[in-house]
């Protein structure tokens, strides 16, 4: 069913069934999952999700989509939540909708470009409750998210996602696969959450703030950026000397494990 997309909500719809199957397959074959879909639109992904998994909760800001979704998806295991996703308390939602405490929870979204970072960070904030996230986003941002140290697009978002999850660039989605056709290609990424690094940091929000500040000026050295974090160049010097980290390095060539070591020394 074709509907008019609303630019203010960043709507770009997909309808190709092969693409839909390929995206949903990334969530795996474990039927006993609570799937939270952000921005279901006309329900292209939602319909298959409701067939494949035990519980699907879709969050949609556009109230005009309600009659379309309710007509297209009549499964008892589907629930529509009309809200701006940035106002949703994910922790509360998961607690209320999870059918039992051992049920896996995953998030999937064809993300509006204009709130990609906000959705990503809100997802990371509840990563301890999640098994996986599958996101479609602007290709340029997907490359950034999935970059590692030494790569051109590596930034604080790359490090933050690596901190919480095993990240994977799944595949590119050409712009002609959408209607209306956007200006750029998209890509699918997956985040498989783990606690490999998270237990090394007590206050994760402060660590994410630290990463933003460290990458605030990419042209500056790790010493200069750390000095701005600590407001004390002498202390920054001491931290890097103590950890035997080259002070002339720029943030984009410093890895996650070293950022964790540096951060813990600032506490």
Swiss-Prot record:
Keywords: Cytoplasm, Methyltransferase, RNA-binding, rRNA processing, S-adenosyl-L-methionine, Transferase. InterPro entries: KsgA/Erm (IPR001737), rRNA_Ade_diMease-like_C (IPR023165), rRNA_Ade_Mease_Trfase_CS (IPR020596), rRNA_Ade_methylase_Trfase_N (IPR020598), rRNA_adenine_dimethylase (IPR011530), SAM-dependent_MTases_sf (IPR029063). Its EC number is 2.1.1.182. It catalyses: adenosine(1518)/adenosine(1519) in 16S rRNA + 4 S-adenosyl-L-methionine = N(6)-dimethyladenosine(1518)/N(6)-dimethyladenosine(1519) in 16S rRNA + 4 S-adenosyl-L-homocysteine + 4 H(+). HAMAP family: 16SrRNA_methyltr_A (MF_00607). The gene is rsmA. One of its GO terms (molecular function) is 16S rRNA (adenine(1518)-N(6)/adenine(1519)-N(6))-dimethyltransferase activity. It is found in: Cytoplasm. S-adenosyl-L-methionine binds at residues 12, 14, 39, 60, 84, 110. GO terms for cellular component: cytosol. Specifically dimethylates two adjacent adenosines (A1518 and A1519) in the loop of a conserved hairpin near the 3'-end of 16S rRNA in the 30S particle. May play a critical role in biogenesis of 30S subunits. It holds the Pfam family RrnaAD. Belongs to the class I-like SAM-binding methyltransferase superfamily. rRNA adenine N(6)-methyltransferase family. RsmA subfamily. The keyword Nucleotide-binding does not apply. This is Ribosomal RNA small subunit methyltransferase A. It is an enzyme of class 2 (transferase).
């Amino acid at each position: 069913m074709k509907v008019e997309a609303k630019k203010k909500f960043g709507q770009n719809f997909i309808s190709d069934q092969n693409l839909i199957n390929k995206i949903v397959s990334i969530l795996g074959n474990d039927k006993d999952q609570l799937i939270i879909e952000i921005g279901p639109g006309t329900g292209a992904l939602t319909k298959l999700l409701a067939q494949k998994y035990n519980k699907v909760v879709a969050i949609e800001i556009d109230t005009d989509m309600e009659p379309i979704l309710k007509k297209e998806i009549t499964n008892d295991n589907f629930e529509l939540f009309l809200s701006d996703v940035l106002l949703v308390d994910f922790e509360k939602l998961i607690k209320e909708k999870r059918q039992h405490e051992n049920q896996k929870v995953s998030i999937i979204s064809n993300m509006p470009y204009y709130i990609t970072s906000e959705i990503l960070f809100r997802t990371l904030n509840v990563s301890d409750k999640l098994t996986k996230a599958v996101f479609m986003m602007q290709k340029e941002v997907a490359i950034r998210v999935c970059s590692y140290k030494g790569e051109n697009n590596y930034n604080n978002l790359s490090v933050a996602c690596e901190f919480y999850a095993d990240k994977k660039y799944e595949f590119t989605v050409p712009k002609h696969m959408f209607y209306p056709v956007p200006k750029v290609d998209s890509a699918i990424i997956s985040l498989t959450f783990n606690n490999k690094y998270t237990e090394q940091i007590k206050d994760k929000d402060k660590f994410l703030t630290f990463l933003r500040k460290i990458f605030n000026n990419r042209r500056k050295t790790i010493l200069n950026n750390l000095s701005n974090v600590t407001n004390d160049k002498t202390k920054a010097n001491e931290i890097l000397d103590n950890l035997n980290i080259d002070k002339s390095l720029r943030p984009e060539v410093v890895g996650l494990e070293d950022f964790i070591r540096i951060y813990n020394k600032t506490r």
